[in-house]
């Protein structure tokens, strides 16, 4: 049947149909190949925006650096990074005047955090540039490698477990004349296989010691590795994102802690809150502007867009802001906070993997690593790539590009928000000293500006003044991409405001469906997503009921667990039918065991096992949730688990769902192909680390893993704990004398082995 799609919208107000224009159904685009080209674009663009700055050379690394601060005032609308220090400082002073004590109080809060944060804070986060191996690794591994190298070079402050002490080590490491590191490498040999008599390639993983001189070490410590940002919807071109190494991360964390604390106190800041809290905050600002624009005033709102926010920001400006915000604080605190921006003004961008070349005629493929771009003959490249390489060559050192101006993506979201809000703050009548005034919202690079004035000329004058003020702080509002409306209709961080926020449901679409973790988690996450959308996103009861039915259908197809009385044949249907026939109370079977679905929109908050518990056969209960059943996963039985949801925009959200450990909460095994690669050494280290921690947990069950305090090592702590426990168990008659003696003997053997070692 043909349906005219416009009929669907006859009864829908136009603003509610906004969802349908969003590119959020289907798979998002992923990037393939290397990010080298995108990174060169970023580096070249950033330098172009600041080209009228002053060139200097870094005395330690020899890197050429461009400093656009206090550069020429712009004469046209082209984006530029020439922020003026005195203007930034003045904006900060006015921000403090409007919010008395804001910096002081935030500094005090941050100082407490600095003294309490443990170094394991840095294990959060995904891929991190590991400077010891010169490539990306999971954050925990990169941290472990860094600490190990520090230890082997005589830096041990970090062993206290405080992040601040680890940062002291980082500072010390930069003064050293050389650093010894261990790197993994691969050897390939062609050998004949005894069984098949074919030639095969054997790979062996070796570790070799390497010494880095001061210059090479500094380059690595200041390096941001780059990758292509994946899964960006609604864009044709990909772009590069950066991942910093462990030396930089800790310092950035403390700066962002201070900035976050400030943002929490600013009503115009869209960070760090999210969701409904953010909407409430925004609605307040709009309400204030609407009520104050009495009948005599006009009120207009700009849905704002900034050109290349990151590439025009400047770490030197952030240094000025931090210096101002911490001006009455102790010296050590000011020093800790000023290191991040200093490191960023000396940062190096790693160009990624390099380029792949293939010759169609000779069926040859070869990789040109980034390190070779400085010297290779350019005749092999096409025009656009040739231009990029020529432009970037003067900046190259050891395969990385010197990138002093600009702030790669996502590094100082909070601090740059403070900068943006400081301009919104200047819109008060006591600062504009005229008939127009403005206010607005800022969230990282996204903003909405509300301007009030008696007439259209006043509105225009207000917008112009805002635009020029932004230019002075290195912010470039895009005149092409920003648009203005009567207040009451605007968009901010993909929230659409039309006399109140309209649910933009399309953005939640990617999180519907089966997540693919395991049968237990997937069921729980699926119904939780539907429940959350009924609460937050105007998902009505009828649609929710339909979403639920579609989800159950999807779930059954994914896990091949159609009802026991169905005709559908799958690999599992034989087992499921057998279970169905021998089950007295069929309603008690979980959906994943071929049972019926008992969910409706009223009971989405109850985990399925609890929902059906009373209906289950006793022996089924015993199999499903019995701790003695080897198939019941007991990694940790917490009532809440976290799933990482990827909403359509913004960072991955943590979503809580109820977790009941059953035979269905299995954990998939790691892909074996990793075992044949150079990652294998890393994997073995990781497993070793895991085993030690698990063992430690067994001895100190209540411990969330913290290094035992005092001088004892982990082994000594475990041995002494074992002795105490054994004695208590022996005296209370829980264990026999033989067992007690055996435990004591083992403890002594362990100590003896340690002494010999």
Swiss-Prot record:
Influenza RNA polymerase is composed of three subunits: PB1, PB2 and PA. Interacts (via N-terminus) with PA (via C-terminus). Interacts (via C-terminus) with PB2 (via N-terminus); this interaction is essential for transcription initiation. Interacts (via C-terminus) with human PKP2 (via N-terminus); the interaction competitively inhibits the interaction between the RNA polymerase subunits PB1 and PB2. The keyword Hydrolase does not apply. Residues 55-64 have a biased composition (Polar residues). It comes from Influenza A virus (strain A/Puerto Rico/8/1934 H1N1). Residues 286-483 form the RdRp catalytic domain. This is RNA-directed RNA polymerase catalytic subunit. It is found in: Host nucleus; Host cytoplasm. One of its GO terms (cellular component) is extracellular region. Its EC number is 2.7.7.48. Keywords: Eukaryotic host gene expression shutoff by virus, Eukaryotic host transcription shutoff by virus, Host cytoplasm, Host gene expression shutoff by virus, Host nucleus, Host-virus interaction, Inhibition of host RNA polymerase II by virus, Nucleotide-binding, Nucleotidyltransferase, Phosphoprotein, RNA-directed RNA polymerase, Transferase, Viral RNA replication, Viral transcription. HAMAP family: INFV_RDRP.
